[in-house]
């Protein structure tokens, strides 16, 4: 076996049928072993990774030791053993009998027309052969005699007892398989003798055996594990009142019911274990890599700090003061919508900050920020005190087991009482150092900058006292995706935080279901960088798709390996989503529910500009409690503009499309209007949650309907010192009216909203309206960020009574 596998050493990734040939078995047997190992191949021609081949060979040897021995017995060829053994001279009657038997079907090797002499007499052995031709010549039978002097007839009969078993040919074929087959049949008959009959089919007893399945597994996967037909399991499910197909992903509860009925126990592998096994199959073992790091390889890395706190308590303003920048104006209503990561210098050291949203709705994003952080800075306003989000942020920091530094903000405002904040925090077991505890409290003013330097010093002191922050910068990079979005002109852009190793331009990375080669990296200031050491946040370009916030990223050696890991992760995630969204309706109450109209479902499609916002909105909607009569199903979510395929999916499933800071393209807009699909747009997440909750409960007030007046495409951009930026536009649909509300759209994403058409000109004349098919100059007030190809959409807000 080992020789066969090594013989293909020049092939980097052998095919499954080649491995089966080396092991002396068939591809179907190896495919079954691969499924038990958690590896899934499509066909015998699928290529296997070298680690998978080694594991497969080991598993095959353990499961089929008899086949391995059989392979070893058949290795030496028969002709090498038999050729030097010449038979002894036989009596004359036996030779004549062999000659007479030639016409009855024995092979005649003496009929080769290209041989120097018929019968190949030149190969005859000297000695006895010189007398035998004389005897045959008298009988006129020279050629057959020479033929059978070389290969005597009794030789095949003597070969069998010498070897003890049939040679690999026509003689003795099938002796061993027949015995194995009969044993298999006997074992199956014995097992099926007492097997229970459920739903008209017979299923072998499980006797409590544990079957490990991945999330989103199907009936076919379960059937292959226990070696039964999927149709039999479907019959059992039907008998239990469950309707399913062989390839449909089932949830854990359904598998537990099915397994209990037939005597098995099902264990659903957790996503972390599943992903760990997937990486190990590609020779990527993260735990082993960390264990291999010696003390000499480790270097001090900067601390990673997460700023947490209640909404509008000054988290982003504090970070802006530290960075000496202003990102607050870019957020809707002054509320942080997206996660940002930045690194600042404090003397000769660095500190990495992660700015998490302060909403309760963004619980998942904030919790994910706590998982990658070393120190949590809890911002509490001195005038407001402790709020619900403050307690929530404190719980996340404690669950992540990270030290806490409390920043008492807004001490410059009237009514500020920092001492009261310290007293309130003691009620939650956060004891200040002034009271004999171990938590540092720093009074600051993010607006004036007072106490910010002291806060940075407190962060470094806490890191030095409570933590040992070291990492190996000389290995391949590992880290976490902080945020990701689809950027116009750049494609998928992800903000990643390197946790160990060094990330370099050109590395092949895998993060979640996305993969690619790092084409470029920029820091928080937009400057290009060639490498990122541990605790360094950078924006990465070159990914195939938009990963999720919180996905871990790794660097692999080959593009093919990165693609295979991402594709397997995507398939596993798709199966898990199908299992989660599957509605389990029993046969007993299915008809009754349809007749009474109790089963009602609201299907939704969510599209957003960044993955973190989409995930947070989805999680918030899943927590809505609207009773048992109405259910909420999110059938699709994604990042980017609303496309025509989204509208088509909404048409088929009668779904509502929610756009968070994104707009539909022209085809999607026309299709939605033609099909009557409800498409709603939001820029603040709480507005979307409130509307959907009220619509589910039937408590919506008369809605404010947004009517589209016109759409213009920017063809040229002009700059005027008197008016400002003028967009030379072509009106594509409707009409553009002066003083109308407008928004600026770029690549399907709303860049600026709440605009007003302040000036409208056609040639040199001021006009009040320009209709479709004409060109005009449009001024949008103080908005200067206008580019060629942008869309200017004018709208009108009207009240619409609800039906």
UniProtKB/Swiss-Prot annotation:
Residues 334-338 are annotated as: G2. CDD domains: IF2_eIF5B, IF2_mtIF2_II, mtIF2_IVc. It holds the Pfam family GTP_EFTU. GO terms for cellular component: cytosol. GTP binds at residues 309-316, 355-359, 409-412. One of its GO terms (molecular function) is translation initiation factor activity. Residues 175-185 have a biased composition (Basic residues). Residues 355-358 are annotated as: G3. Residues 65-186 are annotated as: Disordered. Residues 65-75 have a biased composition (Basic and acidic residues). It is found in: Cytoplasm. The keyword Flavoprotein does not apply. Residues 445-447 are annotated as: G5. Belongs to the TRAFAC class translation factor GTPase superfamily. Classic translation factor GTPase family. IF-2 subfamily. One of the essential components for the initiation of protein synthesis. Protects formylmethionyl-tRNA from spontaneous hydrolysis and promotes its binding to the 30S ribosomal subunits. Also involved in the hydrolysis of GTP during the formation of the 70S ribosomal complex. This is Translation initiation factor IF-2. It comes from Tropheryma whipplei (strain TW08/27) (Whipple's bacillus). The lineage of its organism: Bacteria, Bacillati, Actinomycetota, Actinomycetes, Micrococcales. The gene is infB.
């Amino acid at each position: 076996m080992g020789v066969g596998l090594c013989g293909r050493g020049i092939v980097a990734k052998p095919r499954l049928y080649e491995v089966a040939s080396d092991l002396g078995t068939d591809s179907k047997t190896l495919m079954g072993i691969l499924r038990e190992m958690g590896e899934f191949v499509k066909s015998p021609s699928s290529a296997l990774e070298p680690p998978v081949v080694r594991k497969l060979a080991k598993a095959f040897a353990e499961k089929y030791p008899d086949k391995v021995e059989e392979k070893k017995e058949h290795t030496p060829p028969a002709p090498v053993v038999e050729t030097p053994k010449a038979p002894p001279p036989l009596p004359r009657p036996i030779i004549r009998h062999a000659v007479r038997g030639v016409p009855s079907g024995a092979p005649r090797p003496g009929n080769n027309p290209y041989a120097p002499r018929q019968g190949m007499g030149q190969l005859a052995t000297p000695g006895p052969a010189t007398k035998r031709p004389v005897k045959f010549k008298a009988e006129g039978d020279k050629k057959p005699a020479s033929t059978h002097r070389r290969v005597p007839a009794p030789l095949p009969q003597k070969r069998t007892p010498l070897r003890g078993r049939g040679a690999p040919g026509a003689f003795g074929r099938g002796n061993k398989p027949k015995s194995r087959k009969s044993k298999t049949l006997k074992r199956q008959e014995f097992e099926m003798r007492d097997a229970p009959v459920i739903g008209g089919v017979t299923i072998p007893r499980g006797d409590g055996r544990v079957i490990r399945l991945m999330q989103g597994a199907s009936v076919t996967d379960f059937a292959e594990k226990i070696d039964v037909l999927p149709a039999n399991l479907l019959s059992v499910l039907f008998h239990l009142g469950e309707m399913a197909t062989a390839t449909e992903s089932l949830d854990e509860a359904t598998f537990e019911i099915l397994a209990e009925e037939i005597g098995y126990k099902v264990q659903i592998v957790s996503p972390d274990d599943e992903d760990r096994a997937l990486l190990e199959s590609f020779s990527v073992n993260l735990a082993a890599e960390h264990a291999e790091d010696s003390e000499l390889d480790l270097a001090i890395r900067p601390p990673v700090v997460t700023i947490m706190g209640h909404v509008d308590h000054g988290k982003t303003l504090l970070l802006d003061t530290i960075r000496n920048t202003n990102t607050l104006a870019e957020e809707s209503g002054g509320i942080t919508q997206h996660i940002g990561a930045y690194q600042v210098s404090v003397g000769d050291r660095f500190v990495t900050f992660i700015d998490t949203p302060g909403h309760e709705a963004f619980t998942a994003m904030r919790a994910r920020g706590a998982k990658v952080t070393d120190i949590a800075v809890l911002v509490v306003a001195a005038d407001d005190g402790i709020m619900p989000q403050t307690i929530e942020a404190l719980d996340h920091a404690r669950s992540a087991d990270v030290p806490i530094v409390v920043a008492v903000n807004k001490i410059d405002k009237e009514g500020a009482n920092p001492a009261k904040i310290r007293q309130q925090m003691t009620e939650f077991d956060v004891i200040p150092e002034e009271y004999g505890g171990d938590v540092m409290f720093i009074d600051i003013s993010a607006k004036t900058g007072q106490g910010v330097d002291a806060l940075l010093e407190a962060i470094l002191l806490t890191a030095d006292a409570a933590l040992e922050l070291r990492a190996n910068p000389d290995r391949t990079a590992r880290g976490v995706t902080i945020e990701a979005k689809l950027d116009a002109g750049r494609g998928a852009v992800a903000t990643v935080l390197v946790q160990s190793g060094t990330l370099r331009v050109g590395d092949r990375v895998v993060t979640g279901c996305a993969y690619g080669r790092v084409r470029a990296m920029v820091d928080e200031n937009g400057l290009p960088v060639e490498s990122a050491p541990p605790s360094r946040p950078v924006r990465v370009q070159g990914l195939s798709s938009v990963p999720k916030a919180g996905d871990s990223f790794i660097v692999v050696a080959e593009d093919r390996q990165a693609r295979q890991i991402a594709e397997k992760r995507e398939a596993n995630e798709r199966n898990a989503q199908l299992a989660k969204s599957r509605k389990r309706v029993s046969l007993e109450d299915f008809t009754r529910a349809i007749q009474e109209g109790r089963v009602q479902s609201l299907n939704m499609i969510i599209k957003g500009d960044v993955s973190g916002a989409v995930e947070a909105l989805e999680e918030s909607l899943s927590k809505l409690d609207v009773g048992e009569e109405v259910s909420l199903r999110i059938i699709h979510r994604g990042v980017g503009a609303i496309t025509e395929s989204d509208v088509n999916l909404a048409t088929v499933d009668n779904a509502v499309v929610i756009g968070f800071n994104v707009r539909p393209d022209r085809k999607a807009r026309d299709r939605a209007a033609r099909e009557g699909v409800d498409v709603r747009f939001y820029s603040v997440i709480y507005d979307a949650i409130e509307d959907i909750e009220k619509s589910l409960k039937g408590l919506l007030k008369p809605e404010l309907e947004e009517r589209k007046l016109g759409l213009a495409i920017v063809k040229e951009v002009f700059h005027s010192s008197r008016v400002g930026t003028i967009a030379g536009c072509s009106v594509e649909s409707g009409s553009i009216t002066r003083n109308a509300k407008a928004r600026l759209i770029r690549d399907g994403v709303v860049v600026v909203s709440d605009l007003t058409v302040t000036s409208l000109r056609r040639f040199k004349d001021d006009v009040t309206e320009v209709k479709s098919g004409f060109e005009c100059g449009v001024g949008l007030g103080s908005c200067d960020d206008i580019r060629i190809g942008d869309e200017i959409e004018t709208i009108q807000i009207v009240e619409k009574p609800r039906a």
